[in-house]
C-alpha cells in the first residue's frame, strides 16, 4: 500500500515536471528588439490606493518609454497617504499624464475592479494597458507589448513581470508564483484549447484591444470578484477572443511585497476567493500540496536517519524529492530567481499551506478578505473601509 501511495505521488510530481518543462521550452518573452508595425494610442491605466512608496518610480519609468503615442492615467482610489500628491507632480511635468480622483466604492464592487472600471472610462486609446502602481518598466515596455499583441493576434496579452526580491521571505515564497503558474498550467493549451479553465492573467500587466475589453464587459463583468485578472482571462476565452501569456522580465518588474506580513496578507486575500470560496477545493489543495511538496522531504529525512524503509519505498521517496527539486531548479534558472530558494521548497510550501488556511479562516470566521484597509465578505461585498 505504501509503495502504491508513493508511486501515485511520484506520478503527480512527474506530471508537474512535464508541464514545467514544456512551458519553459515554449513560453515566449517580450523582447527589446520587437517593434510594432503600427502605433495606435495606448492608454496606460494605473489604479493606485496608498501607493506612496512605489508610485513615483512607476511613473518615472513610464515617462521614458520609446513608444511615442501613449497617455498615462492614474486613478487615486481614495488613498489616505501621499499617493495623490506624488502622482500630481507628474501632471505639471508631462502633458501625457492625467490623474483623477476615484469615486467612493459602491456596494457590490471590489476596490481594484471599480478603480479599473473608472480608468477605462477615462481612457482615449485603442489599446488599454492596465498596470499596478508598483511596477517598474524598461524603455521598451509599451513597444514590445504592442508588437507582441499585434504579432500574436491576441485580444488580451498579459505579461508576467520579473519579481524583485530582497528579504529572506521574499526569496523563499515569491518564486512559488512561477511554480504555481508554470508547473500547473500547460501554456500551449491556453492557445490551442478554448476551455476557459485553461486561462490565467497577471493584473500587473494586462494589455487589451479596447474592442475586446468592452466586448467581454470590462471590469464591470467581474466587479464582485477578488481575483479579477484570472476571471477576465477566462471571460476572454469564453467569449471566443484570443489570450496570450508572455514572460515579461526584460520589460517590467515588480516588488510585490517587502515583508513576510505583506506576503501573508497579500496571498491570503486571493487564495480562498480564487478557489470560489470552496472548502473542498481548498482542502484538496492543502492535501495535495502537503503530499507532493512537504511530506516527501520529511520522509527523506526519516529514510536517511532510520533506514527502516524497503529499498523500493526509499527509492520512490528519493525520486519524489529529487524530481521536485529539479523542477524548482529549472524554474529558478529560467525565471531568474535565486537558485538556493529552490532548496527551501518544503518550507515555502508549508508556509503557503498556512496562508491557505488563513485565507479560509478570514472568511469563515466572519471577518472577510482584507486588503488595503477594506474588508470583503464571501460575496465580496464591502464590509468595512
Language-model segments: which ranges?
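Membrane-embedded multi-pass helical conduit in multi-pass membrane proteins
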Residues: 36, 281-366
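Cell-envelope/extracellular polymer assembly enzymes that use nucleotide-activated donors
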Residues: 40-43, 71
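Catalytic donor/gating beta->alpha subdomain of glycosyltransferases that bind UDP-sugars
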Residues: 149-183, 211-214, 219-282, 369, ...
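N-terminal membrane-anchoring/stem segments of glycan-assembly enzymes
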Residues: 1-38, 175, 187, 352
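Acidic donor-binding segment of Leloir-type glycosyltransferases
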Residues: 59-106
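Short, well-formed alpha-helical segments that are part of the catalytic scaffolds
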Residues: 26-32, 51-64
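Acidic donor-binding/catalytic loop of UDP-sugar-dependent glycosyltransferases
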Residues: 82, 131-148
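Long helical/loop segments within the catalytic core of UDP-sugar-dependent glycosyltransferases
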Residues: 9, 23-26, 98-121, 140, ...
Amino acid at each position: 500500500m505504501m509503495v502504491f501511495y508513493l508511486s501515485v505521488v511520484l506520478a503527480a510530481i512527474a506530471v508537474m515536471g512535464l508541464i514545467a518543462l514544456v512551458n519553459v521550452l515554449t513560453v515566449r518573452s517580450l523582447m527589446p528588439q520587437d517593434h510594432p508595425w503600427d502605433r495606435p494610442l495606448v492608454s496606460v491605466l494605473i489604479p493606485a490606493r496608498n501607493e506612496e512608496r512605489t508610485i513615483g518610480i512607476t511613473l518615472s519609468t513610464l515617462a521614458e518609454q520609446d513608444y511615442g503615442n501613449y497617455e498615462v492615467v492614474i486613478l487615486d482610489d481614495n488613498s489616505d497617504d501621499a499617493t495623490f500628491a506624488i502622482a500630481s507632480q507628474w501632471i505639471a511635468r508631462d502633458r501625457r499624464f492625467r490623474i483623477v480622483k476615484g469615486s467612493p466604492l459602491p456596494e457590490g464592487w471590489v476596490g481594484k475592479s471599480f478603480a479599473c472600471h473608472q480608468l477605462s472610462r477615462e481612457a482615449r486609446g485603442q489599446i488599454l494597458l492596465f498596470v499596478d502602481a508598483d511596477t517598474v518598466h524598461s524603455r521598451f515596455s509599451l513597444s514590445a507589448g504592442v508588437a507582441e499583441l499585434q504579432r500574436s493576434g491576441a485580444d488580451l496579452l498579459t505579461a508576467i513581470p520579473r519579481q524583485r526580491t530582497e528579504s529572506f521571505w521574499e526569496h523563499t515564497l515569491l518564486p512559488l508564483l512561477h511554480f504555481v503558474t508554470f508547473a500547473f498550467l500547460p501554456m500551449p493549451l491556453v492557445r490551442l484549447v478554448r476551455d476557459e479553465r485553461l486561462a490565467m492573467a497577471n493584473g500587473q500587466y494586462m494589455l487589451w484591444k479596447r474592442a475586446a475589453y468592452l466586448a467581454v464587459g470590462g471590469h464591470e463583468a467581474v466587479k464582485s470578484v477578488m481575483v479579477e485578472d484570472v476571471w477576465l482571462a477566462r471571460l476572454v476565452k469564453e467569449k471566443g477572443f484570443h489570450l496570450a501569456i508572455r514572460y515579461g522580465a526584460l520589460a517590467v518588474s515588480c516588488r510585490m511585497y517587502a515583508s513576510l506580513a505583506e506576503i501573508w496578507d497579500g496571498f491570503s486575500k486571493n487564495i480562498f476567493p480564487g478557489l470560489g470560496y470552496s472548502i473542498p477545493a481548498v482542502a484538496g489543495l492543502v492535501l495535495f500540496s502537503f503530499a507532493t511538496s512537504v511530506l516527501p522531504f520529511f520522509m527523506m529525512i526519516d529514510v536517511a536517519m532510520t533506514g527502516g524503509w524497503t529499498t523500493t519505498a526509499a527509492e520512490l521517496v528519493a525520486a519524489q524529492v529529487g524530481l521536485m527539486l529539479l523542477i524548482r531548479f529549472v524554474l529558478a534558472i529560467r525565471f531568474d530567481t535565486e537558485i538556493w530558494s529552490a532548496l527551501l521548497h518544503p518550507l515555502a510550501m508549508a508556509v503557503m499551506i498556512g496562508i491557505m488556511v488563513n485565507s479560509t479562516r478570514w472568511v469563515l470566521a466572519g471577518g472577510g478578505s482584507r486588503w488595503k484597509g477594506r474588508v470583503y465578505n464571501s460575496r465580496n461585498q464591502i464590509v468595512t473601509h
